[in-house]
Amino acid sequence: MALSRGIRNNNPDNILRGEDWKGLVRDGQDTDKAFCRLIAPEYGIRAMVIILRRNRQKHNLNRISEIIRRRAHPDKNDTRACIDSVVQATGMPADQLADTGDSGFMTTLLKAIVRHENGEQPYGDDVFARALALAGDQ
């Protein structure tokens, strides 16, 4: 089975190009013109964490339904399917307050998003732990 674009790019949330993320593959080595390509999955997951934290602080997004609607725009995604997938994976109702400041819950949420975006979740807990540690240095 071929790897998904997000897994190949070490960008499991398929973050569009634009921001100068830590760990970006530099021009000349980057073959994807639409999505960021990072040097390791930890850096792609780090970017996910930073985006989730920004959205929580800037837009007060504290529920799975709010978080997913913001990151999976209905014009290009099946937002309901993404919400349902993340709810099932986390075991948390879509409109319950989510503690994204808790590293355990954040890891569960990240794994659910990665699985939905890529059809698989290939990363071990160690990758998520390193990504969360890297996100602390933003």
Where are these predicted regions, by residue range?
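Cell-wall polysaccharide-cleaving catalytic domain and substrate-binding groove, primarily
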Residues: 1-138
